[in-house]
Amino acid sequence: MGLPFYCNYAVQTMKPKKAEKYLNDAVDQMVKTDYRTYDEKTQLWKHAWDETHQQFWANKEDGKSQHCWARALGWYVMAMTECLDAMPENYARRQEVIDLLNKAMKSVVKYQDKKTGVWYDVLDVKSDKNYLESTASSMFAYVLLKGYRKGYLSEEYLKAGVKAYNGILKQFIKVNADKTISLTRCCAVSGLGPGPGPYVKKPNYKRDGSFEYYMSEPIRDNDAKGVGPFIWASLEMEQQGLIK
């Protein structure tokens, strides 16, 4: 979440040579996230990774959590998209980020629900208990639409973005009695741990990364983590003349 600010601050307040050091650090973080959390079997990114492989929610072999939580992946691809805005056109590693964004969005589109155009809360689980979730769907729609406009993604991704946006309108937007609207079915929060440690007052073993855990977290309307990306996606639709 912090990388877009990090990149913009570096570019806007530092001389190019010094700023490049921080841009390289940002790209390293994106690349290492891919390396540490990507799952070849599902072609998705796990919610988290534990360096020690000792956290109670982590796989003891590779340190990864159990599942791909959609909003975690949403944050990841939004960060890449926003960081690219800050990176100068001649920055040596810019294409590296574009390539990684394409890798991620190819998988995102693969997991887009064909019927509704939106995405489930836990992407790698097929279950009647899983639910279509609006914050991640708004994030993905925004990245698909903006990524095409900026030239990072090809036209097929624009089509997926428009389908996603229309799906959001149909699945999640509720018109209230006072004629305002609400974005419904927002996952309030999901996280992992913390486990026991010197600075942990009370471990939270409920947050174990299981599918059952994700389904236990509350769902609410108008969570800012969804409203913001939905507004951004709406602006992209308007800017590109896609709203009928």
Regions found by a protein language model. Name each.
Residues 57-78, 89, 93, 112, ...:
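Solvent-exposed loop and edge beta-strand segments that line ligand/cofactor-binding
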Residues 9-27, 42, 84-103, 109, ...:
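Structural helix-adjacent loops and short alpha-helical linkers that scaffold large soluble proteins
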Residues 1-11, 68-85, 133-149, 223-238:
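Well-ordered alpha-helical segments within folded domains of soluble proteins
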Residues 23-57, 98-116, 160-178:
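Long, well-ordered core segments of solenoidal/helical folds
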Residues 2, 116-117:
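Short, solvent-exposed secondary-structure junction/capping segments
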Residues 4-21, 25-40, 44-64, 81-89, ...:
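Active-site lining segments of carbohydrate-active enzymes
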